[in-house]
């Protein structure tokens, strides 16, 4: 469990892990990244109360989200690693028991994930995610439905991922979980459990939910660039053209609601003609606004393979 400035949420996240009913021992690693609020005190308090169940992973200086994520995972000692960020929580006390049972029953499985409830902080809006659970590499390239807070993976494969992919050499990747799950899809089999086991809190300040459309586009571009890299390395580049189109589609969808489409066309080096801009605006703006009115933040293409 990685955490940074999660004082209002971290206790609930920790308690949800402690509430798991399992036939095996569970060790909770708290990766606390020198928060400026009371998160460190809360984490230290829990670690002191449960010394046999909780281990604190921290340092004297902030190391950043991605480094904290990695050092916390690498500190794990069990056969399996389950992930829950400090602002999320598990809502099913049988979550770990059921997922580990699936992995134990089939050694070819590297990862098991479940459905989640996305809770949008501030508005209280809820979204049951995903509508379609994907497991194959080709489809996950376009729509990675593996929610981090629902995943349970084999630790030896995670270590292989870090050694083989070397994500630290890719600062352009803005997340650590998306590339990891793409690697699992390419190098092992993925299973899904049809149950809602976790709540993913969508904070306004998170990179994926930023209201600033330039940051939102940068995040979407990063996800597509990650998919392009994995397609080139593990998919022989067979999806390159479609992934490039998808990257543009998603960016244009964001701009159709938040900003000028012509700006993105110019930034990508496309001819920003009135006809092209008008065509893109009409194509995306009406559909995007309708979906957002219905409470669905995803672009029109999000569920298509």
Question: For the regions a protein language model found, what residue spans apply to each?
Answer:
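Acidic helix N-cap motif at the loop->helix transition within catalytic regions
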Residues: 9-11, 37-46, 67
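Short, acidic, metal-binding catalytic loop of nucleotide-sugar glycosyltransferases
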Residues: 15-25
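A conserved acidic beta->alpha catalytic loop
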Residues: 32-41, 61, 85
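Glycine-rich, basic loop-to-helix element that forms the pyrophosphate-binding segment
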Residues: 59-76, 98
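Short aromatic/hydrophobic "clamp" motif used to bind/position activated sugar donors
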Residues: 81
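Conserved donor NDP-sugar-binding/catalytic core segment of glycosyltransferases
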Residues: 94-126
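Conserved nucleotide-sugar donor-binding catalytic segment
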Residues: 114, 128-214, 219
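Membrane-interface aromatic/basic loop that binds lipid-linked glycans or pyrophosphate carriers
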Residues: 228-233, 239-240, 244-305
